Amino acid sequence: MIQILLVIICLAVFPYQGCSIILGSGNVNDYEVVYPQKVTALPKGAVQQPEQKYEDAMQYEFEVKGEPVVLHLEKNKELFSEDYSETHYSSDDREITTNPSVEDHCYYHGRIQNDAESTASISACNGLKGHFKLRGETYFIEPLKIPDSEAHAVYKYENIENEDEAPKMCGVTQDNWESDEPIKKTLGLIVPPHERKFEKKFIELVVVVDHSMVTKYNNDSTAIRTWIYEMLNTVNEIYLPFNIRVALVGLEFWCNGDLINVTSTADDTLHSFGEWRASDLLNRKRHDHAQLLTNVTLDHSTLGITFVYGMCKSDRSVELILDYSNITFNMAYIIAHEMGHSLGMLHDTKFCTCGAKPCIMFGKESIPPPKEFSSCSYDQYNKYLLKYNPKCILDPPLRKDIASPAVCGNEIWEEGEECDCGSPADCRNPCCDAATCKLKPGAECGNGECCDKCKIRKAGTECRPARDDCDVAEHCTGQSAECPRNEFQRNGQPCLNNSGYCYNGDCPIMLNQCIALFSPSATVAQDSCFQRNLQGSYYGYCTKEIGYYGKRFPCAPQDVKCGRLYCLDNSFKKNMRCKNDYSYADENKGIVEPGTKCEDGKVCINRKCVDVNTAY
């Protein structure tokens, strides 16, 4: 009540320029009061569903610094998957899973009219809350808590008073990453971000809320849920230049206690969470990546930590995030940073550039948070896709996997539509009736790899060629306009002229792994080098305990080629005969990859050299 009275007094004295006040983001020392006026703005030809509470498109008008602002908003229809679920635990620790409806949600992306560089990430659940970029500057907006008033506060990041100025960091280290110099030499080959074209990819995410978070929010699952939705809506906005969508498929609350040992040692907690994901979560929930959100203060001022190149790996596609700020953009930036590591992005060096330094992959927290990825991040992500081929994000979900009611005229082909080519004025598809989103008379299809001149291609027509020995070509069925989902050769199928065996669509061989780690001239080291894995030493082992100082365990004699990988590096002035690579950030780096041939008829599985006929 006192807070409401202060706001009313402030508005009476300064109707357009606010005095210091506590808002959702914290204590704001300067803000402007605006009164957004809503104007419905459905796409041309679109029909609003009568049962919807939140429109698919909206428009708001207000003024900032005396300048008219027209904010166009479109619902983020890729924020949730259709099979979105929530799991919590009863007082007797029974697992309870529900599937709440999330189709009619209130989270939007947008832009400012007549500003091509503008962006916006807004929650419209109770007024407008979020941020927008106008004329290159980022503004925050949120409703003032005044009964029966449309008043909102608009302010900049620098107007938020930061209580904690101690430097904070990403927990990922880079002791053995590429040096600055090689990056510098390749900068001339880097394609500018605005010229890049990435195929659309989906990361299906599960967020786990640990017990410290449940306690912090006084067991208020609604508040936690809203907070996570707001953060992920902004994460999606950040990743738009990569054409990546982060779809929330599940939310889990550890109500009665943690299911792993969550400690302040970030590295140990991350490893434990990865092992739990591989042994538990993956067995009951389909997803690509999992995030543990905690309120436990992490060592070394760590805000987040993950495994570099970890995306799609069963025990490595995880991240640990500290809920350290009540500013949505701060949290979204940390999540985007850690997810970048999982996608192969390293910390930026002095040679990396973006529109306004620092960039998102800078190793320390930046105030205000960065808004752009660097040239290096784009280059590293592209190389990651080529090298690791992360299959879990390469295959997009089926249209029905993304939850949203169909809207005819929005140019998104959704469940229940035969086609959608936009408004009648904009449609250029000769097969589609833009007014109804139905196929025209005589047309069999309007989109898809197996659609040609409005007719479904004959059965057996190749629609996706085989990429390599471990891939298979896909062919049209004659019944559908869509190419069948990507399939691969069976595990254990010989590949690369019997140099290896197929494993989950790849042909992992030591030679290619050495080249990827060191240089194009690298080869596999002689057998004597692999005998070092019998030692159980710092650089020679098969398995190790969790943590930096974890004990190393030697390989059995028959398994020496399934532990650390040894290479002969023939690059200029090196000529190292038994070279291996170790990374504190990703302890799997430099280990012989699963499925690699270790002897004729044998492959590496769980760091053991086993018969290929019984391995799969």
From Swiss-Prot:
- Proregion residues excised on maturation: 21-190
Used in biotech as follows: Could be used in a hydrogel with the antifibrinolytic venom protein textilinin-1 (AC Q90WA1) to greatly reduce bleeding.
GO MF: metal ion binding; metalloendopeptidase activity; peptidase activator activity; toxin activity
Q: Which InterPro entries match?
A: ADAM_Cys-rich, Disintegrin_CS, Disintegrin_dom, Disintegrin_dom_sf, MetalloPept_cat_dom_sf, Peptidase_M12B, Peptidase_M12B_N, Reprolysin_adamalysin
- The positions annotated for binding Ca(2+) 3 are D471, V472, N486
Which residues does the annotation flag as glycosylated? N219, N261, N295, N326, N497
Q: Where is the Disintegrin domain?
A: 405-491
Q: Which residues bind Ca(2+) 2?
A: V407, N410, I412, E414, E417, D420
Which N-terminal stretch is annotated as signal sequence? 1-20
- Family designation: Belongs to the venom metalloproteinase (M12B) family. P-III subfamily. P-IIIa sub-subfamily.
User: What functional role does this protein have?
Assistant: Snake venom zinc metalloproteinase that catalyzes the conversion of prothrombin (F2) to alpha-thrombin through formation of a thrombin intermediate, thereby functioning as a procoagulant protein. Has a low Km for prothrombin and a high kcat. Cleaves the 320-Arg-Ile-321 bond in prothrombin and produces meizothrombin which is ultimately converted to alpha-thrombin by autolysis.
Protein name, entry field: Zinc metalloproteinase-disintegrin-like ecarin
